Amino acid sequence: DPHSVILWTRRPYAEGARQLLTVEVAEDQAFKKVVAHARAPVLASADWTSRVLVGGLKPAHTYWYRFTDADGNGSRIGRTITAPLPDDPRAVNFAFVSCQDVNEGKLNGYRRMIFEDERAAAAEQLGFVLHLGDFVYEVVWYPEDRPQGYYARRLRDVVRYPHGEKIRDF
């Protein structure tokens, strides 16, 4: 539906089985033009996650959103875009990512994707990023953790470049 988006968040609570969040959707990042409010239940039985359908939006339009709890604590501000109408001739650009392992040291792909998207012409910017996996693994094993002799790499900067370098066939 090009007039709606599904927004998702996770907000753990120490007590209770159900809490309510408020989600606001705005046409500007400063939330001066809020166009929608919705209540979003978070449930212990769903790992304190919530999904909320927000309707009444413009097709192919960028919006900003945030979740707040009853105490006024807020999430980071997110950005979303509604789908275009079926007869919209403009291209819709997708990217996909999958599970990542910090131990392998290849998380710079996310940074590169964002960097290139922010600098692209509007018609070339990403409309959607689909995450195919469900984890970012962040376990780093240290020698004292694995006395049997298996040691993964510790994360460190080997070299820092002031500017990116293009590597042929990389």
Could you tell me what each predicted segment is?
Residues 1-170:
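Divalent metal-dependent phosphoesterase catalytic cores across multiple superfamilies
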